[in-house]
Amino acid sequence: MKSFKIALAQFSPHIGNIDSNAQRMVEQANEAKKQNADLIIFPELSVIGYPAEDLLLRPNLNKRMQKAFQQLKEVKDIVMVFGFVHQTEEGHRYNSAAVMKDGVVLGVYNKHNLPNYSVFDEKRYFSPGHQHLVFEYLGHKFGVLICEDIWSINTVKQLSKLNVETVLVLNASPYEVGKPQHRVQTLTELSKQLNVHLVYLNQVGGQDDLIFDGSSFIINHDGEVAFQAPSFKEELYYSEFDIEQKRYKKIDPAPALDTIAEIYQSLVMATRDYVQRSGFSGVILGLSGGIDSALTLAIAADAIGADKVQAVMMPYTYTSQISVEDATEQARRMGVTFGIAEIHPIVNSFMQTLYPFFGNAPADATEENLQARARGTLLMGLSNKFGNLVLSTGNKSELAVGYCTLYGDMVGGFAVLKDVYKTIVFELAKYRNTLSETPVIPERVITRPPSAELRPDQKDQDSLPAYDILDAILYAYIEEDQSQSDIIAKGFDKEVVEKVIRLVDRNEYKRRQGAIGPRISSRAFSRERRYPIVNGWRPDD
């Protein structure tokens, strides 16, 4: 025997659908066997999916897990390494990996290092393991680790001392910008340092606000990247180990994505998986003629198909003719269902009802917000009637400073751009236009000064700093946790910094009520950034 073949199942589990996941794993294992694979590896917790959250606490989980094992035992003549929930008679619950062949479990590994930071809270559910698992197959010595374990140098060193040749790493590692590259760079050095081959297999797919990019890879013991799977694609991949050369055969990697392309593909996949797995027949959104809704429309159409997307332009007195024209033209180019619904009657009715209560109070943002809420009411009405999911179109910059209207433009079940700064929105729109022969987003949408069009001649910069300045301050404050004085020391205007930070801090209540959206950064407005709504904390200077 000159070589053996490993199958890497870059798998997108349906969280909690244990029977379906197990059946699909059986199908993939059988397909791998047809391709003469000797071993197939699946992601972390692949039987139930990651993160299963409090589904892990359901009393009948163990029974369902045992049923899944019976399904998986049907597979013959190939070794399977897969993730599952291991519950002991003593009541301990582990994040585990099983090695199975011909229906026999050859070994079980319990994850040692349980992450409890950022989006992770595994200590809520699991106990840590302490033993290593090493198995020999086809004359080759394999070790098994699960996700966080590979980042613990002590855990990896302990395993390497057992003379393993290849470490199989099962992962459910969420995406953020730059993370696929970071994994490869860091683990390349580790493989050289410990003189072991690494097979890194990652989950793929969108799950609520998390994105799993896949981006699986194999690194030879000398640091050579032998295989690199595409990002954001569910597929079976194969790699051969040359026994004589003692290395995995080099396969040309998938073309690398630049940052903007990577972000765009991640948002498309996240939107597709959220809509489809939530059971919606399609989506609906307000198409204003502005860049945020234009980009959201493009992502939605790319994710689920233009025939399942409905866009509604809802003009009012302050809506420019340019906006109507651009929205109409984009809808035509993309082939989505499109309609125009005037909101004058709704807003006027609101005004007439409220005027007796307003008395002589001067007009202010209240009247502007009524326009946004009229639009939100229309979208939710259409959603209720036809069963389509409303997509919220706001971006991270606006959400950070509260430049949005509760129960207005914030309505919706999924906020596609929730973790995307406005400056990146522009880059994504330009990128999307390069993907088709005819640009789908009219050029004027990209080049016009942004405006909410809620009052005459309104521009976003009437209320906010220029977006390049705003986003730089926000990134320093949110992603980097820098203090007010540190940000000012970078050269930003003191009053501008104070205003931006004040807006961020006072709008936590709005963000809590917003729809979830895909996480692409290390500090999204979701699981990893949690501040009390009511608090007396003030900037340190």
From Swiss-Prot:
EC number from the UniProt entry: 6.3.5.1
Keywords: ATP-binding, Ligase, NAD, Nucleotide-binding
Annotated Gene Ontology cellular component terms: cytoplasm
Residue ranges occupied by any CN hydrolase domain in the UniProt entry: 4-243
Residues noted as binding deamido-NAD(+) in the record, renumbered to the chain: N369, E398, K510
An example Gene Ontology biological process: NAD biosynthetic process
Sequence similarity: In the C-terminal section; belongs to the NAD synthetase family.
PANTHER family documented for this protein: GLUTAMINE-DEPENDENT NAD(+) SYNTHETASE (PTHR23090:SF9), NH 3 /GLUTAMINE-DEPENDENT NAD + SYNTHETASE (PTHR23090)
Protein name: Glutamine-dependent NAD(+) synthetase
Organism: Acinetobacter baylyi (strain ATCC 33305 / BD413 / ADP1)
Phylogenetic classification of the source organism: Bacteria, Pseudomonadati, Pseudomonadota, Gammaproteobacteria, Moraxellales
Gene name, Swiss-Prot/TrEMBL: nadE
